[in-house]
């Protein structure tokens, strides 16, 4: 409720100068509801304007379940098919979007979202509307530089040249620079790798605990390794770092250490489940929901108690769903 009032006070508006997307534009949407005719969505770059993905435009292949293709709450990249600005109808397609299109649109949306967040913050700070700041500064920068984020990046080094001719005060210019510098600061990446570790021998849980402990011990000043229980024998190795390659290498090293150690015990074995992934957004939320069922790895025996069969099957289904969605994304 508070967020809605803030948006109203700021007069929140679209990212770009044009009021409607154009035919053949790639845009980012959020799925609101699914009905017989299709999926109704909010167009995120155009102030949550409503559009519809027709059922015939969901997939090139036949499908039995709509939920396997699209889900309420998910973000999707779609192509604009038709725009009726008078009636406000916007028809969209998901099936005509290629993997390259998705990457291209996600990169553009990420850049535009950074700019929009900066605009909202600065507008609130100076008591003006988002649209007013867009009209005076941001939209002219889009026209001049192709993308306002590229302009603001250059402004951090050459502000006089970039802001020349814009009808904004020095205070607003300084606020724009201060905010965008913070948003351009490299953010730590979160990576995770799923593993199965078990021991049917005499040492059992103690062997698993020892192997996981060895895996955690490879942490250093640059990369910290955490290992958490999903449901026996499933565990997840998680790390956070600025260097993706370094983080992936460290998780692989932890996996090798764990594998080597558990195999020293009779009946002990190790299996990697899937690839090492960068997590964030919806994927991070799904992982947190899974981990909420169990505590992280510690010296307590409770962390290694076997869940009942229903809990284990439920966790496996959640993980499989997560992988399906990652492939769709």
From Swiss-Prot:
Residues 24-95 form the S1 motif domain. The keyword Phosphoprotein applies. Residues 298-329 have a biased composition (Acidic residues). GO terms for biological process: regulation of translation; translational initiation. One of its GO terms (molecular function) is RNA binding. Keywords: Cytoplasm, Initiation factor, Phosphoprotein, Protein biosynthesis, RNA-binding, Translation regulation. One of its GO terms (cellular component) is eukaryotic 48S preinitiation complex. It is found in: Cytoplasm, Stress granule. Pfam families: EIF_2_alpha (PF07541), S1 (PF00575). It comes from the Eukaryota. Phosphorylated at Ser-59 by eIK1 in response to amino acid starvation. Phosphorylates at Ser-59 in schizonts and gametocytes but not in rings and young trophozoites. Phosphorylates at Ser-59 by eIK2 in salivary gland sporozoites but not in midgut and hemocoel sporozoites. Dephosphorylated at Ser-59 by UIS2. Phosphorylation of eIF2alpha subunit of the pre-initiation complex eIF2 inhibits recycling of inactive eIF2-GDP to active eIF2-GTP by limiting the activity of the guanine nucleotide exchange factor eIF2B and thus, inhibits protein translation. Residues 291-329 are annotated as: Disordered. PANTHER family: EUKARYOTIC TRANSLATION INITIATION FACTOR 2 SUBUNIT 1. Belongs to the eIF-2-alpha family. This is Eukaryotic translation initiation factor 2 subunit 1. It comes from Plasmodium falciparum (isolate 3D7). The gene is eIF2alpha.
């Amino acid at each position: 409720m508070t967020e809605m009032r803030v948006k109203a006070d700021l007069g929140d508006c679209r990212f770009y100068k044009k009021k409607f997307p154009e035919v053949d534009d790639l845009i980012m949407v959020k799925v609101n509801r699914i009905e017989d005719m299709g999926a109704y969505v909010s167009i995120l770059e155009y102030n949550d304007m409503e559009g519809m993905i027709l059922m015939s435009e969901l997939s090139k292949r036949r499908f039995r379940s709509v939920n396997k293709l699209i889900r309420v709450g998910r973000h999707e990249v779609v192509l604009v098919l038709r725009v009726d600005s008078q009636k406000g109808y916007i028809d969209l397609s998901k099936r005509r979007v290629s993997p390259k299109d998705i990457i291209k649109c996600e990169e553009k949306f990420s850049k535009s979202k950074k700019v929009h967040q900066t605009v909202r913050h600065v507008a609130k700070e100076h008591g003006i509307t988002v649209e007013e700041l867009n009209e005076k500064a941001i939209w002219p920068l889009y026209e001049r530089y192709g993308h306002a984020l590229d302009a603001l990046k250059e402004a951090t080094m050459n502000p006089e040249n970039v802001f020349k001719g814009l009808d904004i005060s020095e205070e607003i210019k300084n606020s724009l620079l201060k905010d965008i510098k913070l948003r351009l600061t490299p953010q730590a990446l979160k990576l995770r790798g799923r593993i199965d570790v078990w021991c049917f021998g005499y040492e059992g849980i103690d062997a698993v605990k020892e192997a996981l402990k060895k895996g955690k011990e490879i942490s250093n000043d640059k990369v910290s390794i955490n290992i958490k229980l999903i449901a026996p024998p499933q565990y997840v190795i998680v790390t956070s770092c600025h260097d993706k390659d370094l983080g992936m290498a460290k998780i692989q090293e932890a996996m090798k250490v764990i594998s080597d150690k558990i195999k020293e015990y009779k009946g002990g074995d190790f299996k990697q489940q899937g690839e090492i992934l960068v997590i964030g957004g919806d994927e991070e939320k799904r992982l947190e929901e899974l981990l909420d069922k169990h505590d992280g790895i510690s010296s307590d025996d409770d962390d290694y108690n076997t869940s009942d069969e229903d809990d284990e099957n439920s966790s496996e289904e959640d993980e499989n769903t997560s992988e399906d969605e990652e492939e769709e994304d």
